Design a protein with these regions (language model features):
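HotDog/MaoC-like acyl-thioester-processing domains
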Residues: 1-5, 93-149
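Short acidic (Asp/Glu) patches
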Residues: 81-90, 107-109
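Residues in well-ordered beta-strands of folded domains
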Residues: 60-61, 89, 143-145
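Hot-dog-fold acyl-thioester-processing enzymes
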Residues: 1-85
Length: 149
């Protein structure tokens, strides 16, 4: 299924979410990552972080938001979607109590050759997270391939 090339440049509005310790606890439980820097205020206060921080993979909690943009704008069938690559640049830690603003944009689309699947459609999204002070927290790109039916 070809990607709707009109999706190139499509983006979501800035949307906010407040990070809670409960969200961080849930993610750590799912990952079976019990690092005290993510879970224990007393221990994490003694670290260079100066308090509890969210695990780096916390940004993936915004996946539903991303999927909505991708599926509606690119007109891709979810079962045909393959994760290609992900590059994440971290600028500041995400902490419980932070209000995070996030935005996603389709920045590239086209066709590429794959060793396994032959020629595939692809698209890349840019994910931006910032805090209430307009400080950049995270920028990430994710490449997705779309198998032909």
């Amino acid at each position: 299924m070809p990607i709707d090339m009109n999706a190139l440049g499509a983006e979501t509005p800035w949307t906010q979410v407040t990070v809670t310790q409960r969200q961080i606890d849930s993610l750590c439980s799912c990952l079976e990552d019990y690092n005290p820097l993510f879970l224990d205020e007393e221990i994490s206060q003694q670290s260079s972080n100066g308090g509890v921080v969210a695990p780096p993979t916390f940004i993936n909690c915004f996946r539903d938001f991303k999927t909505t943009l991708v599926l509606s704008e690119t007109e891709v069938d979810l079962p045909l979607l393959l994760h290609g690559e992900q590059v994440i640049h971290y600028y500041k830690p995400v902490r419980p109590g932070d209000t995070i603003w996030h935005k996603i944009k389709v920045v590239d689309a086209g066709r590429k050759k794959s060793k396994t699947y032959g020629e595939l459609n692809f698209f890349t999204v840019l994910i931006k997270l910032k805090n209430d002070a307009d400080e950049k927290l995270v920028e990430a790109t994710q490449l997705f391939f779309v198998r032909d039916k």
